[in-house]
Each structure stands twice: as structure tokens, then as C-alpha cells.
Amino acid sequence: MHDNLPFTSKELAFLRELTRQKVEFMIIGLSAAALQGAPMVTQDVALWFRDIDDSGIKKALKKVGGTWIPSLALNPPMFEGDHVQYFDIVLTVHGIGDFDAEKANTLDVPLGGFSVKVLRLDRIIASKACLNREKDRMVLPALKSAAKALIAKQPRLAKVRTGKLN
């Protein structure tokens, strides 16, 4: 880990390289929630790209020694390599808008010398509520509590966030 961040130095190198390549992406899911202070633990980091064919993705992979594995049948494309083994590529996010619409619903989170876009907690909650899978239902109470606590600590966030937290 790096300075209390939930990423190894190798993972940070890949995220930094994506930003250097000007790849439009955001971190979503429980990793995004954890970066906002929610008490979440997850093994994988879900990345949502504006354009999965952006050449900067493969350039960033090459720079850190990673490999692009194309999609096969119903499986989405994947990354392989020490720097990228815990990153998942998300092609579709249910219950919220498309990438361009949701870009306005992100926060810039500093990660030691650079920042990444992270989907806001209320939008993560909306997506998980829509999916309604057992694993999502299990984390929704904690996500909602975290969202309320964050708003209580920073009341200005209540004006920004339009998602219903109850």
C-alpha cells in the first residue's frame, strides 16, 4: 500500500499512466465507495472507460508491463499483469446514466501526486439498488449509512448529491 491508499505502488503506476495518456475513465463500485470513506472492502477495482477502444489504455498497459486480453463470447475484455491484475473493466453500469452523463457525478480523488475520477456514492447506491443482487443488497445499508455520515460531515455535499439515500 502507498500512504494509506487502498492501492499498491504498481496499481498506482497504472492509474497514473492512464491519466498521463488522458484516458477518460472513472473508478466505480465498492472501490470508489472506499475512496470516499465508506467502510468497504473489495478485492477488485472496477474501471469504467468512456471509450474502451481508446489507444491510451493499451499504451498505459504497455508502460507498466500489462497485457490486454480481448473479450471472448460473453466475457468482457480483461487486463493481465502484476500492475493490473485486480482491475476489472466495466462495459455497462445499470441503474444510472451513460458515461458522459455520469461524468458530472464524479469526484476528483487525489492519489499521491495525481487525481482520478470516482463515481459519487449516491450514484453507486443507485446502481446497486437497481441491480438488486444479493451481494448488492448486503452492502446497501453500509453504503447508505456512509453517505449520510459524509453529508453530515460536509453539509455542502447535500446540495450536490441528488440521489435518494433512504
Locations of regions flagged by a protein language model:
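Compositionally biased terminal segments of proteins
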Residues: 1-166
